Amino acid sequence: MAQKENAYPWPYGSKTSQSGLNTLSQRVLRKEPATTSALALVNRFNSQSTAAPGQKLAENKSQGSTASQGSQNKQPFTIDNFEIGRPLGKGKFGNVYLAREKKSRFIVALKILFKSQIEKEGVEHQLRREIEIQAHLKHPNILQLYNYFYDQQRIYLILEYAPRGELYKELQKSRTFDEQRTATIMEELSDALTYCHKKKVIHRDIKPENLLLGLQGELKIADFGWSVHAPSLRRKTMCGTLDYLPPEMIEGRMHNEMVDLWCIGVLCYELMVGNPPFESPSHSETYRRIVKVDLKFPSSVPSGAQDLISKLLKHNPWQRLPLAEVAAHPWVRANSRRVLPPSAL
C-alpha cells in the first residue's frame, strides 16, 4: 500500500509536483549535503517522472526512456527502508525517532506525523509550506530536511539528526550560559538567519526549545513550523510563544523579518540571565512590559552583552541592530568561539 500511496504527488490538495524533494529546483537538490549518504537521501526522487494528482507514475510516460529507466532505479522511500530506534520526542501531530536507512546505514531523525491529527487541526497546507521552506535551506546551522514520504496513515520527514539534542535542556541543567557560549550562539544565529532572510524566510519562533545541537555543539535551527525533537509546553499561547513575541505582533501590526531580530535579543538575555526579559506573573503584565520595552538587567550581565541586547530589543523594528552588525558586535567578536562543522569547511 505504501508504494501505491507514494505514486501520488502529495497526500492533500491539488499539488501538481511529485512527492519528495522533487518539488524543488534541480539547483537546490544538487547542493551537496554533509555526506554521500545524505546526498542519496536528498536525490532519491530526482529521476522520477512527474505525475499529476491522482495519476500513477506508470501512467505518465511522456518524459522519455532515460527518465523512465531512472525511475525504476530510484523508488520512493517507504518505512521498510528504515530501521527504527529509540524515540527522540513526541509532538502534537506525531513522534520523532532515531532511525537508520538500511542501504546506506545513514543515521537520521525520522519525524512521523499522523494524517488524522493533521486533518483534525486543518493544517495540511501549513505542513506542505513548511516542508518546502525547510527543504530549500542548506546551512551548517540549520537542521536539514533530507526528504519526505507518506503512506495511507502517516507522513514521514527524514531529518538531520542532532546528537546533543535541545539547547533548552542544556540551559535547564546549567540555568545560564557564560559569555563565550552565548556569544557563539549569537554569531551562529546571525549567520543562519541572514541566510534565511536572503531567501525570504522568516523563522518567527527562535527560542531555546527550537534550537538543537550537533555533534560538536554547533547550533542547528529547527522547527520551521514543526518541532523535530520533543517540544516544550512552556510559554505557549494561541498566538505563539508569549515571552518572545515582539511589540508589533502584540499590537496587531504588520511584521517582517525584523521579528527575528527581536527574538534573538530575547534569547541572548535568557541565555545570560536564565529567564526571558519580560517574564511576569500574568500574560497581561508580560504584554505591557513587551510593548513598553521594560528592560532591566541584573548586575551579572556584562556591559557588552547589555549593549547588544538593548540594540536588538527596540520597539521600532527598523531601529533594531541588523544581523550583520550582530555578528560584528565587539562583545560577540571578543567572546565567540564558533567552530564550523565539517560540512561547512
Swiss-Prot record:
Polar residues composition bias: residue spans: 14-25, 60-77
The keyword Lyase appears for this protein: no
InterPro entries found in the cross-reference section: Aur-like (IPR030616), Kinase-like_dom_sf (IPR011009), Prot_kinase_dom (IPR000719), Protein_kinase_ATP_BS (IPR017441), Ser/Thr_kinase_AS (IPR008271)
UniProt xrefs under Pfam families: Pkinase (PF00069)
Cellular component aspect of the GO annotation: chromocenter; chromosome; chromosome passenger complex; chromosome, centromeric region; condensed chromosome, centromeric region; cytoplasm; kinetochore; microtubule cytoskeleton
Sample GO molecular function, one term: protein serine kinase activity
Main location (coarse class): nucleus
Modified residues (N6-acetyllysine): K220
Binding site for ATP: L88, G89, K90, G91, K92, F93, G94, N95, V96, K111
Subcellular location: Nucleus; Chromosome; Chromosome, Centromere; Chromosome, Centromere, Kinetochore
Assembly, per entry: Component of the chromosomal passenger complex (CPC) composed of at least BIRC5/survivin, CDCA8/borealin, INCENP, AURKB or AURKC; predominantly independent AURKB- and AURKC-containing complexes exist. Associates with RACGAP1 during M phase. Interacts with SPDYC; this interaction may be required for proper localization of active, Thr-237-phosphorylated AURKB form during prometaphase and metaphase. Interacts with p53/TP53. Interacts (via the middle kinase domain) with NOC2L (via the N- and C-terminus domains). Interacts with CDCA1. Interacts with EVI5. Interacts with JTB. Interacts with NDC80.
Function in brief: Serine/threonine-protein kinase component of the chromosomal passenger complex (CPC), a complex that acts as a key regulator of mitosis. The CPC complex has essential functions at the centromere in ensuring correct chromosome alignment and segregation and is required for chromatin-induced microtubule stabilization and spindle assembly. Involved in the bipolar attachment of spindle microtubules to kinetochores and is a key regulator for the onset of cytokinesis during mitosis. Required for central/midzone spindle assembly and cleavage furrow formation.
Family per similarity comment: Belongs to the protein kinase superfamily. Ser/Thr protein kinase family. Aurora subfamily.
Protein name per Swiss-Prot or TrEMBL: Aurora kinase B
Organism: Mus musculus
Record gene name: Aurkb
